UniProtKB/Swiss-Prot annotation:
This is Uncharacterized protein YCR041W. It comes from Saccharomyces cerevisiae (strain ATCC 204508 / S288c). May play a role in proper chromosome segregation. Suppresses the high-frequency loss of mini-chromosomes when overexpressed, and this suppression is completely dependent on silencing protein SIR4. GO terms for biological process: chromosome segregation. One of its GO terms (cellular component) is membrane. It is found in: Membrane. Keywords: Chromosome partition, Membrane, Transmembrane, Transmembrane helix. Its main location: membrane. It comes from the Eukaryota. The chain crosses the membrane at residues 32-52, 57-77, 90-110.
Amino acid sequence: MLKYVVTDIGKMCLYIWPYRVWSWRRLFIFRVLNVVSIAILFETPHRLALVPNVCLYTHMAIPLSTCLFCLCLCICIKYDITQTQANNQFLASFFVLILTINDLDVTFVI
């Protein structure tokens, strides 16, 4: 089950990373690190600080939408809100908001 969830997350990540700003090498390394950290997060939800730590260790400019994406995943894991139809609609709206923010190219450096 975890393998499929992480694969889906990896596919979703393809649509939010800023291709125009990062080199392919930097993009690939950060994507792998982030997907691995999310996989560990699914196994051990109490380690919610792991995703920001990966961002910190890579010393990269991070799009605001990526942090919101990770935050949304943490909330889903912690409160298990992916089960009901209403919550699925909320998550869909939230991801649309994330993609909109990403189009604005709002970035900051951790």
